[in-house]
């Protein structure tokens, strides 16, 4: 009986060690990397994010916010797109190590509806990689 219990405990411990490589590193400071040039990258991938290169009457952008997620630390930037008279649509864009890793229509956990926004001239930012 004791041998079986020891075998089960040993198996669980070894299984836990092999799983550790699949989990993100939440403690490392460089997982998210430095703040990306998000305005430039979003301007060049706007069609992928919104589905249309110029889909709105107004387009606004928030500042980059560092967040922790299941994929590890990342930067979140929110976009507010409005085509009048329809209600605005919010999009969340995620960056890690200077690369865009994900984008989606904003969900409640992204908190894009409560962010502060500024006007976004994506045509001007498309050619200037120095803007953040």
Task: Kindly label every feature range from the protein language model.
Residues 18-132:
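Cystatin/cathelin-like cysteine-protease inhibitor module
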Residues 1-17:
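Sec-dependent bacterial lipoprotein signal peptides
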